[in-house]
Amino acid sequence: MQVLRERGIVRLRKFVSAGITAATITRMERAGDVIRLGRGLYQLPDAPTSAYHDHAVVAKVIPTGVICRVSALAFHELTDVIPSRVWIAIGPKDRKPGLAYPALQVVRFSDRHIRAGIEHHNIDGVDVLVTAPARTIVDLFRYRQAEGPRFKSSPGLNIALEGLREALRQHKATPAEIARCAEQVGSWPVIRPYVEAMTANA
């Protein structure tokens, strides 16, 4: 179907607006012509997908959500950790999404910070919001205690340090960018010693 080829992942309401009924989509699903990813979410069975297809699925369901923390760090290739769930930030008053797959780790950003340091990335035809490398590192230091069942035995500080080290080594974030981002949220006193230690002999 053209709409699926063009968009990759399509909501049911998009089909309906194109004149395709829900009953037709159900028949196509039973015939194997489309795959149901989640409630009201479909793609072609042979659609090319990237390593971060789960991010695209989440963004289609939660278009204002922001991929953050460990998921953002992995997306920017700044850690060897492979998160078992997608870390997604939503606003303080947004309803917590119910999604059977992929598994989510939902956090909340304030209205002030929900759009600060955010990048747009096209993943499998979907516009996905991801925290920029500097913002990602600052967030990991701000919330450096272990969070979620996947990280109970993995200290958050270690992941933050790995991200900082790799971001500086790969030139994906400069000390100035990290400092500026940290100052905006009042976390520079916490992060500064680590940045200075890693750049002292650079």
Regions found by a protein language model. Give the residues of each.
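Short His-Asn-centered micro-motif
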Residues: 18, 90-91, 131
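Short helix-to-loop capping/linker segments positioned immediately adjacent to catalytic or ligand/cofactor-binding
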Residues: 12-16, 77, 125, 148-151
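Hydrophobic alpha-helical interaction segments
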Residues: 118-202
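Hydrophobic/basic alpha-helical segments enriched in Actinobacteria
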Residues: 14-17, 28, 33, 64-67, ...
